[in-house]
A protein has these predicted regions:
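N-terminal hydrophobic/helix-forming segments and targeting peptides
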Residues: 1-200
């Protein structure tokens, strides 16, 4: 997502900057010396799962990372990120949910490159439903879109402040990315872009 953000922001700014965690910002510089700094920020990470144990039958136990509505997890397809790539899996169970890799032993799962500490995200396609859309991580992706469109809308405008527009990481786990981003930019004013989930 960070690479995509940089690619989409780049045509509308003077430079792209990153913080140490991977947050990315397009910078529109003012011609004014020692200009104030305005930071417009959203987040680009998404909630997910982390593997905590691989069972003898090949399934894996997990914890949630970020805000996950557990009632939607059973039957969900997952993409598990390993050191060597990605592995497809799905969630089984209701009360005691586990990740199923289609394996029958711990050894088979380990042979896929899956280990304790690996993370997983729900694998959901973007779907249009009449005048609405459904997708995983839409809440963060809409914020990213707003950031890009904002920078595009002001690309030909001159400001007496430096404008930083972009997305941070690790919002789902304590807003750490916002902390490092503000440390990098040191803004005089900050604006947060975001949206809320649909009412159900």
């Amino acid at each position: 997502v960070g690479k995509c953000m940089a690619q989409y922001l780049e045509p509308y700014c003077d430079e792209i900057v990153y913080d140490n965690l991977g947050s990315v910002f397009g910078v529109k510089k003012s011609k004014k010396e020692n200009a104030k700094r305005v930071l417009v920020i959203t987040h680009m990470d998404e909630s997910g799962l982390m593997i905590t144990k691989i069972n003898d039958n090949g399934s894996a136990e997990f914890i949630e990372i970020g805000k996950i509505n557990k009632q939607y997890l059973p039957g969900s397809r997952l993409r598990v990120k390993t050191k060597t790539g990605e592995v497809n899996a799905f969630v089984v169970g209701t009360e005691k949910m586990v990740i199923d890799f289609g394996t029958y032993s711990k050894e088979e799962t380990l042979a896929l490159g899956v280990f304790v500490g690996d993370s997983a995200v729900v694998d959901g396609a973007f779907v249009k439903v009449q005048k609405q859309c459904i997708s995983k991580a839409l809440e963060s992706r809409v914020g990213c879109l707003m950031a890009v469109e904002l920078l595009e809308a002001v690309k030909d405008k001159e400001f007496d402040f430096d404008l930083y527009v972009g997305a941070c990481v690790m919002e789902e786990v304590g807003q750490r990315g916002a902390t490092t981003a503000t440390g990098l930019v040191k803004p005089d004013l900050g604006v947060v872009l975001g949206c809320k989930k649909a009412k159900t």
